A protein has these predicted regions:
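Bacterial signal peptide processing site
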Residues: 26-29
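Alpha-helical segment of the N-proximal tetratricopeptide repeat
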Residues: 36-69
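C-terminal motif of bacterial Sec signal peptides marking the signal peptidase cleavage site
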Residues: 21-24
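Canonical positions in the second alpha-helix
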Residues: 66, 99-101, 135
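Short, conserved micro-motifs composed of acidic
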Residues: 35, 41-42, 86, 90, ...
C-alpha cells in the first residue's frame, strides 16, 4: 500500500472508533446514591487515583463533581481539562484550558500551549497557529527551547492540514459498525486473513462507584470477530491463556508465520503508575498456549513496553518492533530487537532520530511485503494530534517519514493503522 500513489487507486479503510470523547465524562450511569455522601476532598482523592492509573473517563467524572463544590479551584480545573483531553473530548478540554489560562496563566503556563493544541484538534487551524505563536514568544520556562521546537512543529502541522484538506486522497473510510464498535472504546485492530479481526475493547460505559475503587481491575480485553457475507459478528473473547483476569490486555499481533502471538498486558505498579509489558503465546494446532512475559531486555523494569509488531528478516530470523518510554530520543520511541531462529531476543536498539522525535511515536505496524513501517506520531508535522506516517526500510535504515494524508488523518488522533494482507485496504482507530 503506497500512499504516495494513492490517488490512482481507491482504498477502502475501515475505522474503529476510539469514542471516549463522544460518551462524555459527565455521564456514565452513576446514581446519586453511589456518589453521594462523599466530601469533595474524598472525591478528589478518587479522581486523582483514577487519573494516575490512566482511567481518565472515570477521573473527569469525579473532577467535575469536585468543581460543583469548588468552582474556583484552578488546580482541579486543569486536571479536568487534562482528563477531557486524554479522553478525547477536545471541545470540553479547550474550554477548561482557556478558563485556567485566563485566570492563572502564571501558575499554569502550559495551559496556553494545550489551549492552542485543542484549537488545532477541533479543526480551528488559523486560531491555533496564532495561539501557538503567542505561546512560543511568551513562554519562559526551563524547557523553553524544547517548547519552541514543539511550537514550530505544530505550526507546520497547521499549514500542512490546511493544504491536505484541500487535496483529499482517493480513500473511502467506513465505520465498522456496532458489532465491533462499543459505546466506549476499541483499540489495536489486527486482521487475520480476509475474514477475522482481533481487537481490544473496553466493554463498559459506566463510571466506577466509590466502593469499587479499591478493587479496580483491568477492563481492556482481546476479542475476535468473524466476517460472514460481508457482515462482522459480535466479538468473542479470546481464551484466558491470553486474556488474563485482572489485567488490561490489548495490542495483539501475529508473527509472520502465524505461530506466535504477541500482545500487551498492563497493570499499576506500587506507585500507581500504569506499566505495560509484552507477552507471547504460542499458537499450535489451533490452540493457545499459556503466555510468557518476554525477558528484561524487552520489558525493561520500571518502563512501559508495548505495541509489538513483527517483521521478517534474513535466514528465517525475525524483528520485533515495539514502543517503550525507556530513555531514548524523546517520550515514547519505537525500538527493535532481532529474534533468532531459536527465539532469543537481542538487545533492543532505537530506530533513530529520523523516526523518533522529542514527542511520542506509537502503534507501529510493519508490512512484510512492501517493507513499509506505519506508525503514529505527535512529533512530526500533522493534521491533528497523532497522525499516521509511513517509512520504508528496516532496523535503523529508513526513508524520511511521510504523512499519509487526509482523510485517513484527521484533526483528532489517528492510530493503529494496519493494512490488509492483500494491501487493498486496512483498519485504523480514530
Amino acid at each position: 500500500m503506497n500512499f504516495t500513489r494513492i490517488h490512482t487507486s481507491l482504498l477502502i479503510l475501515a475505522v474503529l472508533v476510539l469514542a471516549l470523547g463522544f460518551t462524555g465524562c459527565k455521564s456514565g450511569g452513576m446514581s446519586a446514591q453511589e456518589g453521594g455522601g462523599l466530601s469533595w476532598k474524598n472525591k478528589l482523592k478518587i479522581a486523582d487515583k483514577f487519573y494516575k492509573e490512566g482511567y481518565f473517563y472515570d477521573a473527569c467524572h469525579y473532577y467535575s463533581e469536585v468543581l460543583e463544590e469548588q468552582p474556583d479551584n484552578m488546580d482541579v480545573t486543569y486536571k479536568l481539562a487534562e482528563s477531557y483531553y486524554l479522553s478525547r473530548d477536545y471541545k470540553e478540554a479547550n474550554e477548561n484550558y482557556k478558563m485556567v489560562m485566563d485566570k492563572n496563566l502564571v501558575l499554569y503556563p502550559m495551559s496556553h500551549y494545550k489551549y492552542a493544541l485543542t484549537l488545532k484538534m477541533t479543526g480551528r487551524y488559523p486560531e491555533a497557529k496564532e495561539e501557538f505563536a503567542k505561546f512560543g514568544k511568551s513562554y519562559k520556562g526551563a524547557d523553553a527551547n524544547l517548547q519552541k521546537k514543539r511550537v514550530k512543529n505544530e505550526i507546520l502541522g497547521c499549514d500542512y492540514a490546511l493544504e491536505a484538506l484541500g487535496k483529499p486522497l482517493n480513500v473511502v473510510v467506513i465505520h465498522m459498525g456496532n458489532e465491533i464498535n462499543a459505546a466506549y472504546t476499541e483499540a489495536s485492530p489486527m486482521p487475520v486473513g480476509a475474514d477475522k479481526l482481533i481487537y481490544a475493547s473496553l466493554r463498559s460505559d459506566t463510571v466506577i462507584a466509590f466502593e469499587d475503587v479499591k478493587s479496580r481491575v483491568g477492563r481492556f480485553q482481546l476479542y475476535q470477530s468473524v466476517k460472514t457475507y460481508n457482515r462482522w459478528s459480535q466479538g468473542e473473547l479470546l481464551p484466558p491463556e491470553v486474556n488474563e483476569p485482572g489485567m488490561d490486555v490489548a495490542n495483539g499481533c501475529y508473527s509472520p508465520d502465524k505461530k506466535r502471538f504477541f500482545y500487551t498486558q498492563c497493570k499499576s505498579d506500587k506507585t500507581g503508575k500504569m506499566i505495560c509489558s509484552i507477552f507471547m503465546s504460542d499458537f499450535i494446532d489451533g490452540k493457545w498456549k499459556k503466555a510468557k512475559k518476554l525477558d528484561d531486555k524487552i520489558n525493561m523494569e520500571g518502563y512501559t513496553n508495548t505495541h509489538p509488531t513483527v517483521g521478517k528478516y534474513k535466514k528465517g530470523t525475525q524483528i520485533l518492533y515495539f514502543v517503550s518510554d525507556r530513555p531514548g530520543a524523546g517520550g515514547k520511541d519505537i525500538w527493535y530487537s532481532e529474534i533468532s531462529k531459536d527465539g532469543v531476543f537481542k538487545d533492543p536498539k532505537n530506530l533513530g532520530k529520523k523516526i523518533n522525535t522529542i514527542s511520542d511515536e506509537l502503534t507501529p505496524f510493519y508490512n512484510n511485503e512492501s517493507r513499509v513501517l506505519y506508525f503514529s506520531s505527535n512529533g512530526h508535522p500533522g493534521i491533528g494530534g497523532y497522525d499516521v506516517f509511513s517509512t520504508e526500510g528496516r532496523l535503523r535504515k529508513w526513508t524520511k517519514p511521510e504523512n499519509v494524508g487526509y482523510p485517513l488523518n484527521s484533526s483528532v488522533d489517528d492510530m493503529y493503522f494496519v493494512a490488509d494482507e492483500d494491501e487493498t485496504g486496512g483498519y485504523f482507530i480514530s
